[in-house]
Amino acid sequence: MKIKDLIIVPFLALGIVACGNSSKQSNNTQATEKKVTVKAPVFNADSAYAYIQAQADFGPRVPNTQAHRDCGEYLAKQLESFGAKVYNQYADLTAWDGTILKARNIIGAYKPESKKRILLCAHWDSRPYADNDPNPKNHQKHILGVNDGASGVGVLLEIARQVKQQEPNVGIDIIFFDAEDYGIPEFYQGAYKQDTWCLGSQYWARTPHVQGYFARYGILLDMVGGKGATFFYEPYSNRTARSEVKKIWKKAQELGYGNYFVQQEGAEVIDDHVYVHTIGRIPCVDIINYDPTCEPSSFGSYWHTMNDTMENMDRNTLKAVGQTVMDVIYNEK
């Protein structure tokens, strides 16, 4: 992902006129329905942490490497073991420098027959460049990508495990996007091209795993396991999936995770959610770490460095994100 230059977009206030109903019984029924809240399963942060560790144990999951191939097999088998119908999308994608990437999007579908669907996604690849590392000698080394990549996948694997045991009312699709982090490096002197990022999600949005695929909305998890992480409204999400953003952050407040989910806008980013929406036409919310006080990067001091390792993971952060997402999807009708 990449921070985008600030864009200010005015919002148009829309007036909504509600039709009255003289029936007291109808009004009472509606009021009762609004109060019903489904108790979601308990998200296990230890389990999510273990799935993150398992990915890290393969090493950097950079496309065209053995670690990448081995981890892809692991992820597909995990989803299958959790009862999902698994789809594999293999594609040759062209990187910014002309490298052909042997990419693989991995999709796990629950209740594939249901027309009511929610999309949950994260990227599973590691960045091939530690181009934000304070040591220039590391700039062309592969990063481990524990928070940036593995954390979102780990949370979704734990959600998949829970969905196998207790399915929500709607169909769930979990997608692990590939080749998200192969964008133009900081040391490149040529013209910047936004679409060199998020290659896997661009491919999926153009050629979804199911013809005519559509979901009510999506939730993207990116860098969701760091110590002291905070998640602000991501501006693109807040413009294009505003009601979903409000719903997720409100749920986090209700669950006691307001110190993680900050009800303010952060920085706009280029991430998979942009292409899920612009190409796939599905509104998608990016839950992504944002630290306005961090000097090296608002994504955190170890973003795109050799220090994106397990030492930075916090089970409390994983719990806050995972439980919030689960409570949201289990209360969909």
Describe the residue ranges of each PLM region:
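A non-catalytic alpha/beta surface segment that caps or lines the substrate-entry region
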Residues: 60-113
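Active-site-adjacent substrate-binding region
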Residues: 217, 224-333
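N-terminal capping segment at the start of a domain
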Residues: 31-71, 82, 295-312
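Solvent-exposed loop/turn segments at secondary-structure junctions
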Residues: 62-63, 92-95, 113-114, 124-128, ...
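Acidic/histidine-rich catalytic neighborhood of metal-dependent amide-processing enzymes
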Residues: 140-243, 268, 272
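Second-shell loop/turn segments in exported
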Residues: 35-42, 57-66, 93-96, 139-150, ...
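C-terminal motif of bacterial Sec signal peptides marking the signal peptidase cleavage site
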Residues: 17-18
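Bacterial Sec signal peptide processing site at the extreme N-terminus
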Residues: 21-33
